[in-house]
Structures are given as structure tokens and as C-alpha cells.
């Protein structure tokens, strides 16, 4: 943690797969460490880190086709991790946390989450969630969609936009919800 009072670390199983997260209070015996998360599904690996804005401790779990992010506010390191967005089979997502300090209408902070996911489009989309609206868990597709990948050339592209799979190679593709760059 940024205050140097707590250390979170992963445990490895016999196959060197990170599968559990432990919490250690600096200055106490390792025997007092507490398991805060265990991944039972052997297809998933586990990682732990601090969010970019240093406001959350983040556990990331992932298999080849499915991911999940759990979070815990850094000011409550003895609390319980919560899924940011609950795990959904064959859906990948990642979250970056940011905070515009003092940028609210009355000087309050504006915590945001930038979510990159493939729930609605095989080539992913990016949503921004204003975390002032409610506590997690959030749902995939919540927030403001700011960019969408092209479904062109994807195995399931026609599920997103009918006819896109039959477009000739080299055909320009533009999605009106993407910003002009």
C-alpha cells in the first residue's frame, strides 16, 4: 500500500500458477498473513497490484478467454475485495482507474473507470464509468462508450453488424460512435 503498512502478494501452486492473494501487515510475523482471495479454477491465473490512481488494490484474474477484476479501496486494506464487473464466460475486460481530483461541480473528486471489453464486440470497445453513480459491481457496457473496435473480419462480426463479414478486403470501415482522430 502507498503508506507502506501492508503488502499483498500471490502464492504459487505446484505448476507455478499464481492462485491466491495474501495480505501481510508490515512488522508482523508472516504466520499472521491472511488469504484474501483464492482462485479455484485452474484455468485462471491471479495477479495483484495498485491502480494507477493509487486509490484501489486490484486483483486481476484471467484465463485464455475470460477475465475478472476485483478491487478494494486502498484506505480499507483489511476489507473484502469486490468484483468490479462479475466474471462472465468468454468475456475479457480490463479496467484502469483514474480520478480527477477536485474537478466536480462542488470541488469533489470524480473517480472514473476506463473499461476495455469484448462483451458486445469481438474487437472490443472502451467505456468510461463515472464511479460516483454507485458502488461496484458494475455491468459490462455501463457508462459512456467512447470507442468501438471494427467487427469487420471477426468470426462473429455479423452478430454485431449484419453483413460486415462479407465486406471485401480493403473496404474502409468507420463507426460513427468513434471519435474523429
Language model features: what each stretch is:
Residues 39, 51, 67-92, 98:
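Surface-exposed beta-loop-beta
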Residues 1, 28, 75-78, 102-108, ...:
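Secondary-structure transition/capping motifs at alpha-helix termini
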Residues 2-3, 10-20, 39-43, 61-68, ...:
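A flexible loop/linker signature enriched in serine peptidases of the S9 family
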Residues 116-118, 124-141, 146-149:
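Helix-coil-helix junctions within alpha-helical repeat/solenoid scaffolds
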Residues 19-62, 71:
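Polar, glycine-rich mid-to-C-terminal structural blocks
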Residues 28-40, 75-86, 134-145, 170:
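Blade-edge beta-strand/turn elements of extracellular beta-propeller
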Amino acid at each position: 500500500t502507498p503508506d507502506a503498512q501492508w503488502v499483498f502478494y500471490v502464492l504459487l501452486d505446484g505448476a507455478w500458477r499464481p492462485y491466491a492473494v495474501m495480505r501481510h501487515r508490515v512488522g508482523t510475523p508472516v504466520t499472521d498473513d491472511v488469504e484474501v482471495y483464492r482462485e479455484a479454477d485452474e484455468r485462471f491465473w491471479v495477479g495483484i497490484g495498485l491502480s494507477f490512481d493509487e486509490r484501489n488494490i486490484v486483483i486481476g484474474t484471467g484465463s485464455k478467454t475470460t477475465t475478472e477484476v476485483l478491487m478494494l479501496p486502498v484506505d480499507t486494506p483489511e476489507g473484502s475485495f469486490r468484483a468490479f464487473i462479475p466474471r462472465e464466460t468468454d468475456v475479457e475486460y480490463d479496467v484502469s482507474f483514474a480520478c480527477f481530483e477536485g474537478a466536480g461541480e462542488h470541488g469533489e473528486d470524480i473517480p472514473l473507470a476506463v473499461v476495455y471489453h469484448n462483451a458486445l464486440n469481438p474487437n472490443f470497445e472502451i467505456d468510461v464509468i463515472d464511479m460516483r453513480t454507485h458502488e461496484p459491481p458494475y455491468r459490462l457496457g455501463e457508462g459512456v462508450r467512447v470507442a468501438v473496435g471494427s467487427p469487420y473480419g471477426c468470426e462473429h462480426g455479423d452478430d454485431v453488424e449484419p453483413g460486415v463479414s462479407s465486406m471485401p478486403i480493403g473496404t474502409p470501415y468507420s463507426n460513427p460512435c468513434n471519435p474523429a482522430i
